[in-house]
Amino acid sequence: MHKKSLLKRIIIFLGVLGPSVVTTMAGNDGAGVVTYSVAGAQLGYAILFTLPILTILWAVTQEMGSRIAIVTGKGLGDIIRERFGVRIAMFIFAMLLIGNFGNIITNVAALKTSSEMLGIPSFPFIVITILFCFMLVTLTKYEKSQKVFLTGMVFYIAYVFSAVKSNPHWGEAVGALFVPPQGLLTKDYLIVSIAVLGTTITPWGQFFVQSYMKDKNVPISRLGYAKLEAFTGAFISNIFAFFIIIATAATLFAHGVPLESGEQAASAIKPFAGEFAGILFAVGLVNAAIIGIIIVSLSSAYAFSEFFGFTGSLDDPYKKGRIFYINFLFNMVAAAILVLTPWFPLFGIVIGTQVLNGVLLPLFFYYLLKIVNDPDIMGKYVNGKRYNYFTVASTVFIAFASIAAIAISIFGV
């Protein structure tokens, strides 16, 4: 009897599985891989100390978004527009759209560089990739596209093999997760830590998980399983972040080789870990960039539909959800055109995107907490006192980190 009950619970969990896992794994997109690679090369195993903290923060924020979607049946854009007015909604939407677009540009740039490392001409590869992404989203229903997204996550195993081939000191790496490193409060450590935080917990991720969970139509009776899924997704995602960091920490940092551009990591680790490890790293980056392009573009399409009251669902046929799908395509095509333009100031766009995300993230969490603690919206599913203490403390921490990121980006302090 107990075995049947356990099997039933596993089946139910697998039925709920998807939104949070897809969102958190997409956090390891091209931009995320670039950030983790640079972090490992600059600080070595020491930066691993941030991962357990970020895993908890990420899981908690994802869980709140999932819970709001299941209880209300609405996306975040819908609720902000309805509860806080059009002006606030338009301000948040404008900043989200610009920040998302910068992130899409970063992912297309990562796709371009990594494809060239593999000897693939970037222009036709980017065109074919965008066509594939558009056809995948428009020609498949929610369940099928979700299976493709989850299957794509398997390719992150490339980073596990790449890390193993780098011959790291496993005891030192695992210990770094729990032991505060020397220089914890130095400028360099704080800057890199903020960058890792910024690539992990993002405005687009919070909007996407709620819209995607709403699109899945998970019943409220499955709320506990959705919470478990949020924590599972954050844990699995940062396991892969752990291996990405190790791959560059055990090679580039260990040999004092500087790395300023994460896209070059695949080439840089070859002399130390071998040709195969470099190829695996590049393949992983291609996969991560494609997933990032799709998910962040979908985040913008969902948000546009919610803020302006249009239909937006992966289960809608193209004719019914035309605006949703056109918005999705526009973000990808526009980003590709800019990346393929030789004179385009990519570095400035990346910095500007970080600043915008830094402004939006504390603001977003302010409204997220107001929504999740409003009994008129959430009924009995508002945050409990202890949970709320932790979420408020987490929000304050994220806000201070975001402010620090803005100061560093603008003033270089």
What do these predicted regions represent?
Residues 67, 71, 89-119, 126, ...:
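Hydrophobic transmembrane alpha-helices that form the core helical bundles
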Residues 93, 117-139, 155-159, 320-336, ...:
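Transmembrane alpha-helical segments of multi-pass small-molecule transport proteins
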Residues 56-71, 213-214, 235-264:
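Extracellular/periplasmic helix-exit of transmembrane alpha-helices
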Residues 2, 35-40, 63-88, 113-115, ...:
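Flexible loop linkers connecting adjacent transmembrane helices
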Residues 8, 38-63, 77, 81, ...:
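Extracellular loop-to-transmembrane helix junctions
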Residues 23, 50-83, 91-102:
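Juxtamembrane transmembrane-helix boundary signature
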Residues 86-87, 123-128, 232, 236, ...:
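Loop-to-transmembrane helix boundary motifs in multi-pass membrane proteins
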Residues 154-181, 190-211, 367-376, 402-413:
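Hydrophobic alpha-helical segments and their helix-loop junctions in multi-pass secondary transporters
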